[in-house]
Structures are given as C-alpha cells and as structure tokens.
Amino acid sequence: MVRGDMVLLGVVRAPHGVMGLVKVRTFTEDPSHISAYGPLTDGHNCFNVTVVSVLGADSVIAKFDGLSSRTESEKLRGKRLYVSRSSLPRLQEDEFYENELIGMDAKLEDGTAYGVISAILNFGSCDIIELSTSTGKVVMVPFSRSTFPVVDVERRVVIVVPPEVIGVGSR
C-alpha cells in the first residue's frame, strides 16, 4: 500500500529488449532524475533503478537491479513507482507537486464552489489545470498566479479567477 507521503515518479510501460530493461514513463522535470532520489517502491517492493538512456521528455529505458530477462521485466508492466516525499528536493514557495494539486477543491473569489482539479496538462507553453466543474463541464485554465491567486495545500483548496474567455457563467 502506498502511504500518503509518497510521490509518484513514474510508471513502467513495457519491457525493452531481452536483457531485463524496461521503458518507464517519468513524471520528473528531467526524466533522468527518476533514479536520483533513492530506491523506488510500488507500495510492496523496493527497486534500485538505473537510467540507461533517455527516450524523450517523459520516458527512459531503465535497469532494475535483479532483473535480467524479458520475462522478469514483463511482471513490472503497469507498476506505479513512488518515492518518499522527504527524499525529494525542497520546493520553492510557488512550486507544487502535481499529486498535491489533483483532487483539490476550486472555489471562486467569493467562496462559491467551482469544481475540482482533475488533471494537470502541459502542451509546451505552460501548465494547464483541468477542472471538473460543479455543473459537470470540464474547463482548462492556465496555471498562473493571476488565474490561481491562492493555492492552499494544507486546506486542499485553490481560488480560481477564470479568464474572461471562459467566464464564470460557463460553470
């Protein structure tokens, strides 16, 4: 079981070759850093991971200690890989881990419930917050101080000021 202080760093996609290597989708800013914070866990087992090569902005080929065949690495397919939050670098004041934001309540400046953060996306220029609104619509809003002036991690709530294009009436 994964504890509440664990942060998701990656997911094993598939075996790579016949020597026990695997493709891993990473959620770290630099994909090669998935192995930089110590052993990873799926909640049951610990894995010492070495990055063999970086495949792109969010994927690596990795070696898990103790795996030497495709058959062994196949068993890791779909495993979610976590690390203790205390192993990660301290964040700056306006930085957040993605898993902290997902599921947070979003309220308007007057306190009216607006929705819940359902996803964080990035299409190149900035992070986009996907909000599932209280009316059932899905709205995408740029993650900036002007649209999210308050992010309260402890209370699990954000204040959202929807851009004029979206408008409050689109709730």
UniProtKB/Swiss-Prot annotation:
The gene is rimM. Belongs to the RimM family. This is Ribosome maturation factor RimM. Binds ribosomal protein uS19. Its main location: cytoplasm. GO terms for cellular component: cytoplasm; ribosome. Pfam families: PRC_RimM, RimM. Residues 93-167 form the PRC barrel domain. It is found in: Cytoplasm. It comes from the Bacteria. An accessory protein needed during the final step in the assembly of 30S ribosomal subunit, possibly for assembly of the head region. Essential for efficient processing of 16S rRNA. May be needed both before and after RbfA during the maturation of 16S rRNA. It has affinity for free ribosomal 30S subunits but not for 70S ribosomes. Transmembrane segments: none annotated. GO terms for biological process: ribosomal small subunit biogenesis; rRNA processing. Signal peptide: none annotated. The keyword Isomerase does not apply. One of its GO terms (molecular function) is ribosome binding. The PRC barrel domain binds ribosomal protein uS19. Keywords: Chaperone, Cytoplasm, Ribosome biogenesis, rRNA processing.
